[in-house]
Amino acid sequence: MSALGRYDRHCDSINSDFGDSVRSCGPEQEELHYIPIRVLGHGAYGEATLYRRTEDDSLVVWKEVGLARLSEKERRDALNEIVILSLLQHDNIIAYYNHFLDSNTLLIELEYCNGGNLFDKIVHQKAQLFQEETVLWYLFQIVSAVSCIHKAGILHRDIKTLNIFLTKANLIKLGDYGLAKQLSSEYSMAETCVGTLYYMSPEICQGVKYSFKSDIWAVGCVLYELLTLTRTFDATNPLNLCVKIVQGNWAVGLDNTVYTQELIEVVHACLEQDPEKRPTADEILERPILSWRRRDMEEKVSMLNRSNKKPRTGTVTEAPIAVVTSRSSEVYVWGGGKTTPQKLDVFKGGWRARQVCAGDAHFAVVTVEKELYTWVNMQGGSKLHGQLGHGDRASYRQPKHVEKLQGKSVQKVSCGSDFTVCITDEGQLYSFGSDYYGCLGVNQSAGSEVLEPLLVDFFLNEPVDQVSCGDSHIMALTRSKSVYSWGCGEYGRLGLDSEDDVYSPQKVEVQRGLCIVNVCCGSDGSFLLTLTGKVLACGLNEHNKLGLNQYTAGIINHEAFQEVPYTTSLTLAKQLSFYKIRSISPGRTHTAAIDERGRLLTFGSNKCGQLGVGDYRKHLGINLLGGPLGGKQVIRVSCGDEFTTAATADNHIFAWGNGGNGRLAMTPNERPQGSDICTSWPRPIFGSLHHVTDLSCRGWHTILIVEKVLNSKTIRSNSSGLSIGTLAQSCSSGGSGSREEDSDRESLTSDPSRGFRGTIEAEPETGPFNTTENMESSSCPSWLRQELEEAEFIPMPDTPNFVSAESSQNGTTSMQDVRETPPDALEKPSFQACTCSTLQEEVRKLQDLVSTYRHEQELLCRENSRLALEVQELNGKLQSAMQMNQVVNKHGEAIHQIQKQLSLHWKSSPPSSGNPEMSREDSDAESWCFLGTEACRSSSGTPM
């Protein structure tokens, strides 16, 4: 299908969304859940709001367009952006996911770019020129995006630094397709004056037709700004600016001492006055300065986009349902002498937390914007070794952003005893803090302490998916499902079949056929979870905290107990094989696990009741918790020093074990009278109902994220009866030819930086009524006067069956002709009958036709099934016939052998007495009896 055909098809499908006033929620409709985070900005037509989509925990942007206060042209632009984006799929183009209609507000769901735009990037350079490699990296991505949209037959018409967005990994995303235009071929032209003045090509300024080469001019302007940090053309007013563009008077020259001549030639080629002499996007990519880097850059783009890439949850032909739930999100900490949960006011609103982790002496939090915050715990008193990553050893009591990771999207973080490790969206691993045991993974090449995040080069070609830290060792799971470990090797906690310390990542050999999906480190042991829910463990098994001990009881042998002190290689925890484990959390002396049914299992030491079984006795095996947790589905669990905290699906939080130093958030008044400081039964804590999204316990401390639902709203794509079907028709017709029919005007928007950054659209020709005196003297608003001036008068016949010959010839009558018509000729206006019923009848006929086709299709499917069965039956008969043929062939061969034997027998035997001829004939008849011939049958009836 051609690009134009796809454009029309998408336009019609989107129009059906807007045109239908009511549509039932069928079983095929998908329900998507969103949580608003913060407002990103305000535009001319509405707000841009950041949302978190709970299905995949991703961030998306909802672009709101208030349709009620827009002109028809502006509505068409909004619809046009959806149509264009739905056609384009490229790593350097803003991805479109969905659109919804809430009353009179159009909501467009787009990809979120957390690195701002190229305009802000240039401003923040502060006269510090970009490196040429950086410019080439940006240029390659921009031109790749332009090449994609041009191949789809789309003219962007508003390429500028404000519409070029970036991620924190410097991945370019070309956006804002509201002014984009679909052309029927590469030779088609457009003529409407649209775009931003600073980036307008000379042909647009001169009011002549333009093509895809106009976008190349804008690319040249963007490249010029990257090289000079200034506008290509600058002026105090629009007229002077257009003159400079047409004359080609650049603001400043290019410095060939900083940039190569090849790169400067690209600028000159793109800013060629003659459009025919400008290169295409593909020709720019083929230039030597980019071509020899192209493969590496394409691989880099693909790798950086891997974390952002997600399948579209719906197409424009579907009608998904959006469930928007407003939630309050808060972070609480307690322990270390603090018995009351303390709320951290830093993590709220747009800076809410998505992951938390506790270390022995510090906390770490990753926000929804994927920024890392660290600070010391409330206990304090411990010497710091740089595990906060702030470049010093200061004890920051409040959460502080790790500035050295600015520009990096931190996905996950894990804390050790005195070090911290985090991974980014690209799978890069950073470490900082103490390197005494080699936990930083750089072979102790950076010193005993690293105060700032340090990139571990080992994983540059092996992106990391998960990381977990013990007290003094680390395990990492890569995206290729390989497991690596390093650090202290005591008790074999690294799973490397030895107890040696390792200062750089070493691959852990996993049994063939096992797919590891999760790694988790305890204080001196490690766990690996497989795809089937099995558990592999290594390290110290004191108190059976790894679940490796074997305990059996029977009639003959009343008790059989096999203890495993420790293991240096990965060993299957057989006692856990009866369950399909979904998550596991090791503490210092015990471990808790959750199976696929949400049941909680505990094993290890029970000295302080941390197993939650209602007593303080020693338990040798695995304990399936009941009591207060009986029948509840546990969703989160974490183990600290001699205590356990768990959260359930019904929004309750439980804690049990050693309550000393505030570990259980239990004040003396809450403790039952006469009881000790420990509790062996899970007890609810934390007051009212809260949904826990993440939980971490370490030492005496607990940190968690809790959410409360404030309100919820369901948005259906077709919840409004607002119809803008004419907009879809105009979009579709606009893309079918080489000439645009746009005649709307858009006023020039102001530029906060003293310029003309905004987008304008103006028709070069003026209407015929600009000099009409009575129109000028009237109190009619200017916009309405303009609409009347450009309107056309369509005469309507008196009856639906009557068609004026003049109307059929002229089609429409201009307003000038109406003025010249005598008044008496206009006294009796005629009206055409409403054709809505006719259209409805046509729709019903089409629906009947579709139903007929569907019925015929079902019949064909049944017939195909029947024929398939017959073919299968015939194949079976054919196989039987072939087998019979083989049997017959074998019998024939046997008969042939018998014939040969008989022939030899008669030749070797002497002739019998009597008539020799008669004897020979009788012998022949006897021999043929083996064949069942007629001679044999006839002779058998003759008496001997």
From Swiss-Prot:
Pleiotropic regulator of mitotic progression, participating in the control of spindle dynamics and chromosome separation. Important for G1/S transition and S phase progression. Phosphorylates nek6 and nek7 and stimulates their activity. This is Serine/threonine-protein kinase Nek9. Belongs to the protein kinase superfamily. NEK Ser/Thr protein kinase family. NIMA subfamily. Keywords: ATP-binding, Cell cycle, Cell division, Coiled coil, Cytoplasm, Kinase, Magnesium, Metal-binding, Mitosis, Nucleotide-binding, Phosphoprotein, Repeat, Serine/threonine-protein kinase, Transferase. Dimerizes through its coiled-coil domain. RCC1 repeats lie at residues 370-426, 427-480, 481-532, 533-597, 598-650, 651-708. It is an enzyme of class 2 (transferase). InterPro entries: Kinase-like_dom_sf (IPR011009), Nek9_STKc (IPR042767), Prot_kinase_dom (IPR000719), RCC1/BLIP-II (IPR009091), Reg_chr_condens (IPR000408), Ser/Thr_kinase_AS (IPR008271), STK_NEK (IPR051997). Transmembrane segments: none annotated. It holds the Pfam family WD40_RLD. Its cofactor is Mg(2+). The active site is at residue 158. CDD domains: STKc_Nek9. It catalyses: L-seryl-[protein] + ATP = O-phospho-L-seryl-[protein] + ADP + H(+); L-threonyl-[protein] + ATP = O-phospho-L-threonyl-[protein] + ADP + H(+). Residues 738-748 have a biased composition (Basic and acidic residues). It is found in: Cytoplasm.
